Amino acid sequence: MCGICGKLVFDGQGISENLLEVMCKSFSYRGPDDEGTFVSPPVGLGHSRLSIIDLSPAGHQPMSNEDGTIWLVFNGEIYDFQEIRERLKSDGHTLKSLTDTETIIHLFEEEGIDCLKQLNGMFAFALWDGRQQKLWLGRDRLGIKPLNYYWDGRQLVFASEIKAILCDPDVSREIDHEALDLYLTLNYIPAPWTIFKNIRKLMPGSYLVAKKGGISVETYWDIPVGTEQRENRLTGGAPLEETRDFKQRLYALLEGAVERRLISD
């Protein structure tokens, strides 16, 4: 469990590195092993690290590509990163660490935001593309890792936890009355709402892109619907005629999923 945070402002207002440090400290228990910040207006990124993959200083975040045009803060674990890493190396990419974080950076160089479709894991990340002056926020398919953001039409502030967003004095703490109504009706606040106006949860299987002029949120994955789609997912497209075949395939999928999750340093 790590913590990520950051801010994007295109109106010329500077980004305070001290603010990023305060935001990181607000969830330091999420990442007690290391802390880092990156500031290059109009963007600032912060990270608190819990070391799981590659415990060396090479795993320090925020992390960049070779020429510093792409910067990433990442929380989570990518279970198929080793296969992706080998493919990237064969395509000529030079990777300096053994982290899944660096793998995402180079995969983004190849695929753009479509790289999300190749990631098997639990994650939330923020990626700054300095070439296009765009900030991307991404979240895993099932929303295992949290990611919240504040947008008031001028600035974007994001973090793993809402209390880190509230560390920014520019962020309004106004109550969202629609969210309050939902809470009184349902006894909880469903995503993407939060109790604070203009603070939202990034939905599972979604990404946000922020650029000069505004933000947009898109869905890159959703739960398959329909019997045929579910069976294709379970069988890999092969016909299964007996209940025994389904059991064997399901067992193989579960066994493979558990094996992938045993990767750590």
Predicted features by range, described:
Residues M1-D265:
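Cysteine-centered catalytic environments shared across enzyme families
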